[in-house]
């Protein structure tokens, strides 16, 4: 979700959440956006 497996859209999504500074793609196929 949120653009994964591309880290950039996920990172931008996480930065939009108050208190979060970014995120990355994780999970078996890097399909989960982790903030």
From Swiss-Prot:
GO cellular component, one term: extracellular region
Protein name listed in UniProt: Defensin-B
This protein's record includes keyword Coiled coil: no
Organism: Mytilus edulis (Blue mussel)
Similarity comment: Belongs to the invertebrate defensin family. Type 2 subfamily.
Database matches in Pfam families: Defensin_2 (PF01097)
Cited function: Has antibacterial activity against M.luteus and E.coli.
GO biological process annotation, one example: defense response to bacterium
């Amino acid at each position: 979700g949120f653009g994964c497996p591309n880290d950039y859209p996920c990172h931008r999504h996480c930065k939009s959440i108050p208190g979060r500074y970014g995120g990355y793609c994780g999970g078996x196929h890097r399909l989960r956006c982790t903030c």
